[in-house]
Regions:
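A structural signal for well-ordered alpha-helical segments within the folded catalytic domains
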Residues: 1, 16, 39, 138-145, ...
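Residue-level preference for the first positions of well-ordered beta-strands
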Residues: 1-3, 183-187, 231-233, 326
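Metal-dependent active-site segment of extracytoplasmic phospho-/sulfohydrolases and closely related
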Residues: 3-7, 12, 21, 212-254, ...
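Short catalytic/ligand-binding loop motif for oxyanion handling, primarily in non-cytosolic enzymes
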Residues: 12-15, 52-54, 163-166, 195-198, ...
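Short, structured active-site-proximal loop/turn typified by the sulfatase FGly-forming signature C/S-X-P-X-R
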Residues: 13-61
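His/Asp/Glu-rich, glycine-adjacent segments
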Residues: 48-203, 212, 272, 290, ...
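Acidic/histidine-rich catalytic neighborhood
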Residues: 242-283
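Active-site neighborhoods of enzymes that stabilize oxyanions during catalysis
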Residues: 270-390, 404
Length: 409
């Protein structure tokens, strides 16, 4: 029997320091994707690269925006008042999630600092939850569909949006002893670890919560072992680590300041500004030239770089530029953008989405079984084949031609 514990945003050195049970297992750092959590989850559950599963960011340019209705209300898209935008975001999210039209983990986020005139140009990359049978079904098979197709008795704990601190702890108790005896696999989703890291960084609040999670994993392992007549194994992992941000005023980059230096405004161009990625789409060559000129200024200051073909090849980011971004600037750690689609960033102490090679960005992989000696670092691509191997679904590994490797001895 396999117990998989996913913890969002737990970094390797904090696991070693504050999670003694997990640290006592076989452990390796895990290398993240060059993107945010939505890209990581898609890679974890499909065993495919970003340019294969095609989820890089939550938002992409497209025709199926949940905000299309804004354009139908006369003059509404020109009313860029923050309280109004927050209200429109809240109402739209409620309508789409309550109706079941969108069940994705993200829901329908508010595009806080993006002018309303652009909202209708963007759609969600994922519209349903990762364990929905239709998720990525047109492209490949996901972990959850493989479980269903092979009649693996399983339970999924706390995999839903608006994750709260104790959800996994509480929801795990609904599995009775009788049900535990039937099961081959349990997937536990612990998403609040990422919230704690964003809010508190490496401070004591995060450390205390990690210890609580560690105790929960240990107690669940012991509870299942007492009941199940099968050999019980653990795989515990995160999608990425966290990097402590420089929260001084100089480190919070308002990209529009650089456009102003050139006599421009960032919102003259179709854009999505996130924590450390700025994406642009162009209506003509002049716009492209003007944006590129500004982004080169940021490059010359050593703040980051425009993502070029070499970077796309290295990190498997050869996606459709018309949807994901025709020009993308990456802002390097420990800085972040302010005035983004997510808000203003002033209260965020720790972040992710940075180059996967940053040591503080390494996530965790912990296992009761020994990991192959030659494996120094784990890739998110390895999660699916290792899980299927543990469930004795090796034929599926061969058929799917997964990109990762099996990690166990």
């Amino acid at each position: 029997m396999l117990l998989t514990f996913f913890m969002d945003g737990v970094k390797y050195d904090m696991m070693q320091e504050h999670m003694p049970f997990l640290a006592s297992l076989n452990t390796r750092p895990i290398i993240s994707e060059f993107g945010y959590s939505c890209a990581c989850h898609a890679t974890m559950y499909t065993g495919r690269y970003i340019d294969e599963h095609d989820t890089w960011f939550i938002w992409q340019k497209g025709e199926n925006s949940p905000y299309k209705w804004i354009d139908k209300v006369p003059l509404l898209k020109y009313m860029n008042i923050l309280p109004l935008k927050l209200l429109l975001g809240k109402v739209t999210n409620k309508v789409y999630t309550k109706s079941g039209k969108i069940t994705a983990y993200s829901g329908v986020p508010c595009l806080v600092n993006l002018p309303l005139k652009y909202w209708s140009k963007f759609e969600l990359a994922d519209k349903v939850m990762w364990n929905n049978p239709t998720w990525k079904a047109e492209k490949t098979k996901s972990l959850f569909n493989i479980l269903r197709e092979n009649n693996i008795e399983h339970e999924i704990i706390a995999l839903h949006n608006r994750t709260q601190a104790d959800d996994a702890f509480i929801e795990s108790q609904r599995i009775t002893e009788e049900r535990l005896r039937e099961l081959d696999y349990i997937y536990y989703f612990i998403g609040y670890t990422d919230n704690m890291m964003h809010s508190h960084g490496e401070e004591k609040e995060s450390a205390e919560y990690l210890r609580k999670v560690d105790n929960f994993i240990k107690s669940e392992y012991e509870r299942v072992k007492k009941v199940s007549d099968k050999r019980v194994e653990i795989i515990a992992f995160s999608d990425h680590g966290h990097i402590t941000l420089d929260t001084s005023e100089n480190a919070l980059i308002n990209i529009n300041d650089y456009f102003k230096y050139q006599g421009k405004n960032v919102n003259n161009y179709i854009n999505l500004i996130e924590s450390n990625f700025a994406r642009f789409w162009f209506r003509n060559d002049t716009e492209r030239q003007e944006v590129e000129e500004v982004l080169h200024k940021l490059e010359h200051k050593g703040l980051g770089f425009i993502i070029n073909k070499d970077i796309k090849d290295k990190y498997h980011l050869n996606v459709d530029e018309s949807r994901h971004g025709e020009m993308i600037f990456y802002l390097d750690a420990p800085r972040e953008f302010t005035n983004t689609i997510w808000g203003f960033g002033h209260s965020v102490k720790s972040g992710h989405g940075y180059l996967p090679t940053h040591p503080k960005h390494f996530g965790i992989f912990c296992s009761t079984r020994e990991i192959k000696e030659e494996v120094e670092k784990v890739s998110l691509l390895d999660i699916l084949p290792t899980t299927l191997n543990a469930l004795k679904l090796n034929e599926q590994i061969k058929q799917l031609e997964l990109r990762g490797k099996e990690l166990w001895q």
